[in-house]
Each structure stands twice: as C-alpha cells, then as structure tokens.
Amino acid sequence: IWLTALKFLGKHAAKHLAKQQLSKL
C-alpha cells in the first residue's frame, strides 16, 4: 500500500514540478 501511495505522490509531484518549470520558461 505504501509503495503505491509513494508512486502516486511521486507522479503528482513530477507533474506539479513540470508545470512550474514550463511556467518559468
């Protein structure tokens, strides 16, 4: 359960960071 939760959070964080990087560019 923890692994799947971490994977989900990781994907969510990656998307959020990607959006921030795109907005900066």
Swiss-Prot record:
Tissue: Expressed by the venom gland.
Effect after changing residue 20 to H: In B9; no increase in lepidopteran larvae mortality at day 1, and 97% at day 2
Alphabetical keyword list: Amidation, Antibiotic, Antimicrobial, Cytolysis, Hemolysis, Ion transport, Membrane, Neurotoxin, Secreted, Target cell membrane, Target membrane, Toxin, Transmembrane, Transport
Residues annotated with Leucine amide modification: 25
GO BP term, pick one: defense response to bacterium
Recorded superkingdom: Eukaryota
GO molecular function: toxin activity
Record localization: Secreted; Target cell membrane
Reported impact of residue 9 to S: In C6; 4% increase in lepidopteran larvae mortality at day 1, and 100% at day 2
Consequence the record notes for mutating residue 10 to Q: In B9; no increase in lepidopteran larvae mortality at day 1, and 97% at day 2
Major localization class: secreted
Something else known: Mutated toxins are expressed as transgene in yeasts. Yeasts containing transgenes cause lethality when feed to lepidopteran larvae (S.frugiperda).
Function: Forms pore that permeabilize the cell membrane. Promotes efflux of calcium from synaptosomes, causes hemolysis, and dissipates voltage gradients across muscle membrane. Potently inhibits the growth of bacteria, yeast and Leishmania. Is lethal to lepidopteran larvae. May function both in the prey capture strategy as well as protection from infectious organisms arising from prey ingestion.
Family designation: Belongs to the cationic peptide 04 (cupiennin) family. 05 subfamily.
Protein name: M-lycotoxin-Hc1a
Protein's organism: Hogna carolinensis (Carolina wolf spider)
